[in-house]
């Protein structure tokens, strides 16, 4: 192999290392696990179990607090697995905290996110409100279909109980819920940092401690982009975004980790040394033994074992998984209108499954299948799998209702 080919391979590895860190710390931890937690807490504190919005959102909070608590013990804590296996090391949570300062809840709605990232443009004639600039973009194509199904379901459901904006504005529980989700009633939040000599973190909404009950997203509560929660449209978009984050977004960033990154040379998470310069022994090694140079540069054996073991667990579906379009409580409501709306949602998701399967058979859509012959199924809802048995373990498909792993 020519040395320039080795340099190019190393360059791609450095990019992948940084992308791996962004994926784990931002796309996964921050943008799903961390930001959803204040909504979980506010829902349980401010909305009675008979409140229609509590019934709407409850399935999408299943086991989230439990898995987040475990994450703080072994993943995001000082000297935890994140610090051990991703390139920022001890700065991992600092990076998440810094990025959180510019986080925008409304931009996590998929159509808005795609436009912000330059992957779509506003298009009033499209049923999704946007048109894709890259048509063969499986995450966006499948995601917009799922997003639309979620938003249609939420809209129909909410309008059963809120026939006008005045009714919504007069709902004391709902307004208290939204206020708690945003406002810091007691404390100003301190951004994540180590306490001198302790190795422990003090942090914002990413590491909720004793003040969690009164915090929510308090440190960014004054941002002008927050919905005011005065219209049905705002409620529908807010609940749709919460459900999207908890279900489809988390499925897309989590359950493909082992299938796509289980072979560490293909997806290194740490770089052990900088790009070799001409005249150095590292450059000579790149010339004479490129494979050895590559292995010496990327994630170590111990870090690889820990990292692969971790994503193997994270990428696995449990046998009791409850997928989008399913309810684990058959008698979740006695309202026939709500039941009919949910059944329409379920059938819509099953239709999306068929569309995804057909697209994955289309040879012209190369990004869906690729040279590796690995079809994109991360946003395949798996609604039709009534007992979840066919999707147990590492399947790289299925959208669970909630962030439970």
Enumerate the predicted regions with their spans.
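Long, compositionally biased charged/polar stretches
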Residues: 1-405
């Amino acid at each position: 192999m020519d040395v320039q080919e080795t340099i190019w391979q190393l360059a791609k590895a450095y990019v992948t290392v940084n992308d791996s860190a962004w994926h784990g710390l931002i796309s996964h931890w921050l943008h799903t696990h961390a930001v959803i937690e204040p909504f979980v807490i506010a829902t349980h504190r401010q909305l009675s179990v008979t409140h229609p919005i509590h019934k709407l959102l409850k399935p999408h909070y299943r086991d989230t607090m439990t898995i987040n608590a475990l994450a703080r013990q072994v993943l995001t804590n000082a000297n935890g697995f994140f610090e051990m296996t991703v390139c920022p090391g001890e700065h991992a949570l600092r990076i998440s905290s810094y990025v959180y300062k510019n986080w925008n809840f409304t931009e996590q709605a998929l159509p808005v996110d795609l436009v912000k990232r330059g992957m779509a443009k506003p298009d009033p004639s499209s049923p999704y409100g946007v048109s894709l600039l890259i048509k063969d973009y499986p995450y966006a194509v499948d995601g917009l279909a799922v997003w639309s199904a979620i938003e249609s379901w939420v809209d129909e459901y909410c309008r059963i109980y809120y026939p006008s904006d005045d009714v919504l504005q007069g709902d004391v529980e709902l307004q208290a819920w939204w206020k708690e989700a945003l406002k810091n009633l007691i404390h100003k939040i301190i951004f994540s940092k180590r306490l001198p000599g302790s190795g422990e973190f003090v942090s914002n909404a990413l590491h909720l401690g004793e003040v969690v009950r009164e915090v929510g997203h308090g440190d960014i509560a004054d941002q002008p982009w927050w919905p005011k929660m005065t219209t049905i449209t705002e409620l529908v978009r807010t609940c749709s975004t919460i459900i999207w984050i908890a279900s489809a977004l988390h499925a897309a960033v989590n359950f493909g980790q082992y299938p796509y990154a289980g072979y560490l040379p293909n997806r290194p998470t740490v770089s052990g040394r900088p790009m070799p310069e001409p005249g150095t022994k590292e450059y000579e090694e790149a010339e004479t033994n490129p494979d050895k140079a590559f292995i010496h540069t990327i994630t170590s054996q111990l870090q690889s074992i820990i990292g692969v073991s971790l994503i193997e667990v994270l990428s696995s579906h449990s046998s009791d998984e409850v997928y989008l379009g399913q309810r684990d409580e058959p008698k979740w409501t006695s309202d026939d209108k709500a039941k009919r709306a949910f059944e329409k949602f379920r059938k819509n998701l099953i239709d999306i499954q068929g569309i995804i399967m057909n697209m994955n058979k289309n040879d012209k859509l190369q990004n869906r299948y690729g040279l590796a012959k690995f079809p994109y199924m991360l946003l395949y809802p798996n609604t039709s799998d009534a007992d979840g048995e066919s999707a147990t373990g590492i399947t790289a498909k299925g959208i669970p209702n909630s962030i439970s792993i």
